[in-house]
C-alpha cells in the first residue's frame, strides 16, 4: 500500500540511506482485481481476509491481539521517545516486542494466503 512506500522514503531521508524496492506487490489490489472472495471476509483488508481464511482452516496463523497498523506505528514512535528518555535499548521495550510480533504475524499471514492461492488456484 501507500503507507509502506511513504515510510520507506522517510526512513531513507532520516537515515541517509538509499534503500530501493523496484517492485511493490499490493495483495489487496490483486484480490480486488481478480475478484477473490472468502466467505466471512467483510472487505478485502488483510485482517478481514486472513481471519475468514483462518476460520475456514485455510491458513494456520492469525493475530491474537486487537492491534492495527496505525496503533503499531504510534507505539513505535512512543517507544522511541521512552527509550531515549529512560536510556534503554529500543528493542528491549516490551511494547516494541509486541509490535514486532504483530508485524511478524502480518508477514506470515500474507505468505500463507499467497501460498494457499498458489496451491489451490
Name each region found by the language model.
Residues 1-121:
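DEDD superfamily 3′-5′ metal-dependent exonuclease/proofreading module
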Amino acid at each position: 500500500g501507500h503507507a509502506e512506500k511513504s515510510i520507506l522514503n522517510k526512513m531513507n531521508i532520516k537515515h541517509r540511506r538509499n534503500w530501493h524496492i523496484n517492485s511493490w506487490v499490493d495483495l489487496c489490489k490483486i484480490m480486488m482485481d481478480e475478484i477473490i472472495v472468502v466467505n466471512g471476509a467483510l472487505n478485502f483488508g488483510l485482517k478481514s481476509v486472513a481471519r475468514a481464511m483462518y476460520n475456514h482452516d485455510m491458513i494456520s496463523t492469525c493475530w491474537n491481539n486487537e492491534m492495527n497498523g496505525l496503533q503499531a506505528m504510534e507505539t513505535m514512535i512512543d517507544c522511541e521517545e521512552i527509550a531515549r528518555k529512560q536510556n534503554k535499548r529500543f528493542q528491549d521495550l516490551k511494547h516494541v516486542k509486541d509490535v514486532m510480533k504483530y508485524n511478524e504475524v502480518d508477514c506470515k499471514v500474507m505468505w500463507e494466503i499467497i501460498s494457499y492461492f498458489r496451491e489451490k488456484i
